[in-house]
A protein has these predicted regions:
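Interfaces that engage single-stranded nucleic acids at replication/repair/recombination sites
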Residues: 2-3, 15, 30, 39, ...
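Conserved P-loop
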Residues: 6-7, 12-89, 93-98, 254
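Short, well-ordered beta-strand core segments
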Residues: 42-44, 142, 179-182
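Surface-exposed alpha-helical segments enriched in charged/polar residues
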Residues: 73, 77, 130-133, 271
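Long, low-complexity, intrinsically disordered polar/charged segments
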Residues: 75-117, 230-242
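P-loop NTPase motor core
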Residues: 94-171
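Conserved GTP-binding G-domain of TRAFAC-class P-loop NTPases and closely related GTPase folds
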Residues: 150-257
């Protein structure tokens, strides 16, 4: 794509959640998944059981990062984009664990910290961003659902509620969010609320919209209305020029991948592609290095890297069509 800066126009902000990333974390049974699946055209990516009590929900079980990558590929298809407008990740805690395991397997390490100098978490951040920011850029509203935990502040004088992720992971995921809220009940038996701002710092939350309400009822309508009010208030500072109400566009078993079968299929596909055109050699190398690393060959893939090998095969199948 040729870059032409003279063709650029001011960004137009949508007052619904299209293209935004929302992170809802909190106590169990506070309506997080219910709120998220109230969004138009919602696809629930279920990484843990619990959606069976939600009538009408459309859910896809996800049991590995390889499957998450496959879902992302599917969501790029025009016919799939016609079906879904929102993607709900329940829970982001498990998704991040799958991503870390994938990265460790890809680089032959046991833990992200083993890479040294923070490289492991950089790889994790890049991989996680690549999947979910891509969906956001495609026009999907992305919602992360997560658990909460309570910690003691550094000075030991107060308690802080925050997501149950470790510090590095939490920083990556919270940093992606346009809206970052805590779901809870103020009193037992009361309706749940969503805290979006907290002046005393006792609850981790926030937003890119500076006029967003501090607290709202725990439902989709209240959230979209709050975002709309915040955007319109900020838009008034710019004479309302850049605002639109339109959209800018049982426990599952993990799939068992057959390493030997995938290696055999790689050889078959590589042979067919090279027979069609010798120029496919560069394309095959590019696909392999994308998943195994620069300078790596498919023949060097170990059984522990079977997820990466599967993704290589999927792309080669597309290339061979």
């Amino acid at each position: 794509m040729a870059i032409n800066l003279t063709a650029l126009k001011p960004n137009v902000v949508s007052t619904d959640l299209t293209g935004y990333i929302t992170y809802l974390y909190g106590q169990p049974k506070t309506g997080k998944t219910t709120l998220a699946t109230q969004m138009p055209g919602a696809l629930l990516l279920a990484l843990e059981p619990g959606y069976h009590a939600l009538p009408g929900v459309i859910a896809q079980d996800v049991t590995s990062w390889s499957e998450m990558r496959q879902v992302c590929r599917e969501l790029k298809k025009p016919e799939v984009k016609e079906m879904f407008k929102s993607v709900v990740v329940d829970t982001v805690d498990i998704a991040s664990d799958y991503c870390k395991k994938y990265i460790c397997s890809q680089h032959g390490i046991e833990d992200l910290a083993d890479a040294g100098y923070g490289k492991g978490y950089t790889w994790f951040k890049d991989e996680f961003n690549d999947v979910f920011r891509t969906l956001s850029q495609l026009g999907y509203a992305v919602v992360f659902i997560g658990h909460d935990k309570e910690i003691v502040s550094e000075d030991g004088k107060s308690k802080i509620i925050r997501p149950a992720l470790n510090n590095s992971t939490r920083t990556v995921i919270a940093g992606m969010a346009d809206v970052y809220g805590y779901a809870h009940q103020k009193e037992v038996g009361q309706m749940s609320v969503l805290t979006l701002r907290c002046s005393d710092g006792s609850i981790e939350c926030g937003s890119r919209f500076k006029y967003l309400d501090e607290e709202i009822p725990m439902n989709y309508k209240a959230l979209t209305e709050a975002v709309g009010r915040a955007i319109n208030k900020e838009a008034a500072e710019h004479d309302n020029k850049f605002i639109t109400n339109e959209r800018i566009t049982p426990v599952p078993k993990a799939e068992i991948l057959d390493y030997d079968a995938l290696m055999a299929e790689f050889q078959t596909l590589a042979g067919e592609l090279m027979t069609k055109s010798s120029s496919n050699g560069i394309k095959i190398t590019s696909i392999v290095e994308r998943y195994l690393g620069k300078g790596k060959k498919a023949s060097e893939a170990t059984p522990d890297q079977v997820e990466m090998l599967n993704l290589i095969i999927l792309e080669m199948r597309d290339l061979n069509k």
